[in-house]
């Protein structure tokens, strides 16, 4: 390392010693969270060209992430970091930059105008810089939380990673403005759970559900649907694991994939391979909604608990499967063919329990709505104590995975378990949720739900760009608030959701009419969306709607797998009484690290190690 000033020389000397120590203890520090064959088990391409590739591992004991960034073609430097929604403004960054004299690595941040500043608290610590035939490798680490106001708090949910390329040497770091750079974003879950892999049964077999040599369309976004079928007479099996198969060279284009089983009520489903929004798509494909497997960029293999498996095949189960592949092609690359898909691992030796999937949250109904121009409007759905008392077995159920779901305006989703009126634990939470990144996530800890418990699912929405109210429903411009929880043992309870009582919503429309000069159409022939569309969205009408959702009785959907409600009275039910709420977690501030550099690290990246 070449050091241009005494202050930086002193920091670099201390730091050089620390680097040697870190490299010796790195594998030990990560032991238990990485397979023996790789200290960096998680990988994603950051940019469509494959110039930047990120690998990482997690030390939960140290509350630290170790990153390895491969820069295949380095010009004058790169930016990498995180931000709330993937913007380059107000971003937490680490920057490799060059001037006429040398190269530097430093912790930085950007302000609301995209101007980059060196961070006074250097929380990204460089451990190694090495040139190889593949490119430049940068190994560095970062605590989950730093308590630095300019830093991003790394949490369990979605993280929006950002990157940018520097084309020419700089006079100084402060001369960077992100608005003039070639930049991009990638979404990923960084904090993967550290769960031991269960052993697979001796009779495990595999089945590949793959796209049939698809010519990826030359457009930015494509959802491709492909229908295939199980062999005739395929008996009942348990899926015990699945993993992605991504065609080599397409790693940056295949964004996520799902395998759905079709409804058993149809004896046949027409074969189809084409865009999911094609007018040629058979209508029956809309009834292929039962999720067997789901994968998103950055995820690895999904294992079921040793005591449970997901049943498919046999009597009462459809032979037809639908593969859906989301191609993300921002550079509009043409001529690329793809056969990506999902490999299912299954066994004929059925495990003790069938795994089930239950829907929590809000019913798909327009009575739940978000006013326009809202930055953080919250809607909440309930799975009530009355429903769980009636529908769950005496021994309860065990939730081991979860898939959160909203449409385009969703920003946060959380499901909380409450018992005896007190919130006790988080089932799943994503404070940076994106509707463009949905995956089934293993829970770090299995959540046990007992009869009489309450499951509360809340979604936060942003409708700043909308002129009319956004109502609940199936359409992509309508909204949902759902948590698909994966659990065992399977029960008859498939859907446990709520919505405000329609009669109380009608009272809201009458109240709006009484206190506003503009008349809201409440005539019998007017639909709920039409009535919401005629509401003048002043502060009074917004606050009253918010209050209504917070106290009005609810209509409960406590449904069997046959879509029929369990016997009982489910309309005009009181909201569950919650007397104690969980406190928001307080970020842990790591102790001041004497080995952290006081300023940027100076590198020699012409070859060898820095």
From Swiss-Prot:
Pathway: Catecholamine biosynthesis; (R)-noradrenaline biosynthesis; (R)-noradrenaline from dopamine: step 1/1
Disulfide bonds: 147-589, 225-276, 262-288, 383-496, 387-558, 459-481
Main location: membrane
Enzyme class, spelled out: oxidoreductase
Transmembrane feature ranges: 10-30
Keyword Nuclease: no
SMART domains: DoH
PTM (free text): Proteolytic cleavage after the membrane-anchor leads to the release of the soluble form. N-glycosylated.
Catalytic center residues: 223, 405
Coiled coil (UniProt feature): none
Keywords in alphabetical order: Catecholamine biosynthesis, Copper, Cytoplasmic vesicle, Disulfide bond, Glycoprotein, Membrane, Metal-binding, Monooxygenase, Oxidoreductase, Signal-anchor, Transmembrane, Transmembrane helix, Vitamin C
Family the UniProt entry places it in: Belongs to the copper type II ascorbate-dependent monooxygenase family.
Protein name: Dopamine beta-hydroxylase
Gene: DBH
């Amino acid at each position: 390392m070449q050091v241009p000033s005494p202050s930086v020389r002193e920091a670099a000397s201390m730091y050089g010693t620390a680097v040697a120590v870190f490299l010796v203890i790195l594998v030990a520090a990560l032991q238990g969270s990485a397979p023996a064959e790789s200290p960096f088990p998680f990988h994603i391409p950051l940019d469509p060209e494959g110039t930047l590739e990120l690998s990482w591992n997690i030390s939960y004991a140290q509350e630290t992430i170790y990153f390895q960034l491969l820069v295949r073609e380095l010009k004058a430097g790169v930016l990498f970091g995180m931000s709330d929604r993937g913007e380059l403004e107000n971003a937490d960054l680490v920057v490799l930059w060059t001037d006429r004299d040398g190269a530097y690595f430093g912790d930085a941040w950007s302000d609301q105008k995209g101007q980059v500043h060196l961070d006074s608290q250097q929380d990204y610590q460089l451990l190694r810089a090495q040139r190889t035939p593949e490119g430049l490798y940068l190994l560095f680490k970062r605590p989950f939380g730093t308590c630095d106001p300019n830093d991003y708090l790394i949490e369990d949910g979605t993280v929006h990673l950002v990157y940018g390329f520097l084309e020419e040497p700089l006079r100084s770091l402060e001369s960077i403005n992100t608005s003039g750079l070639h930049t991009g974003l990638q979404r990923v879950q960084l904090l993967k759970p550290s769960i031991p892999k269960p052993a697979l049964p001796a009779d495990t077999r595999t089945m590949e559900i793959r796209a049939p040599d698809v010519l990826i369309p030359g457009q930015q976004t494509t959802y491709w649907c492909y229908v295939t079928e199980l062999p005739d007479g395929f008996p009942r099996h348990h899926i015990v694991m699945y993993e992605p198969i991504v065609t080599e060279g397409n790693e940056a284009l295949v964004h996520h994939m799902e395998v759905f089983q079709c409804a058993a009520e149809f004896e046949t489903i027409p074969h189809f391979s084409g865009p999911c929004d094609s007018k040629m798509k058979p209508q029956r494909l809309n009834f292929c909604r039962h999720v067997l497997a789901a994968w998103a960029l950055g995820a690895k293999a999904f294992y079921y608990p040793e005591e449970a498996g997901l049943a498919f095949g046999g009597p009462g189960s459809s032979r037809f499967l639908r593969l859906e592949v989301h191609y993300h092609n921002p550079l509009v690359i043409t001529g690329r063919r793809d056969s990506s898909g999902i490999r299912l691992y299954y066994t004929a030796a059925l495990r003790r329990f069938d795994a089930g999937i239950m829907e929590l949250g809000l019913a798909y109904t327009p009575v739940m709505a978000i006013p326009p121009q809202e930055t953080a409007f919250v809607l909440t759905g309930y799975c009530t104590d009355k429903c769980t008392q009636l529908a769950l077995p005496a021994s309860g159920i065990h939730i081991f995975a979860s898939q959160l779901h909203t449409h385009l305006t969703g920003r946060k989703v959380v499901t909380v378990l409450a018992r005896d009126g007190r919130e006790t634990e988080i089932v799943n939470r994503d404070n940076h949720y994106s509707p463009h990144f949905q995956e089934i996530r293993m829970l770090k800890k299995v959540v046990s739900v007992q009869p009489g418990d309450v499951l509360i699912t809340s979604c936060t929405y942003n409708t700043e760009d909308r002129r009319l109210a956004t109502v609940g429903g199936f359409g992509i411009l309508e909204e949902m608030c759902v948590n698909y929880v994966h659990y065992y043992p399977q029960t008859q309870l498939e859907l446990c959701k709520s919505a405000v009582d329609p009669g109380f919503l009608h009272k809201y429309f009458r109240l709006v009419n009484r206190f506003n000069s503009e008349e809201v159409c409440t005539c019998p022939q007017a639909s709920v969306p039409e009535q919401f569309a005629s509401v003048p969205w002043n502060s009074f009408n917004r606050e009253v709607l918010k209050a209504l959702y917070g106290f009005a009785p609810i209509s409960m959907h406590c449904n069997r797998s046959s879509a029929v409600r369990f016997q009982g009275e489910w309309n005009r039910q009181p909201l569950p009484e919650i007397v104690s709420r969980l406190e928001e977690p307080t970020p842990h501030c790591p102790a001041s690290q004497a080995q952290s550099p006081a300023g940027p690290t100076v590198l020699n990246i012409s070859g060898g190690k820095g």
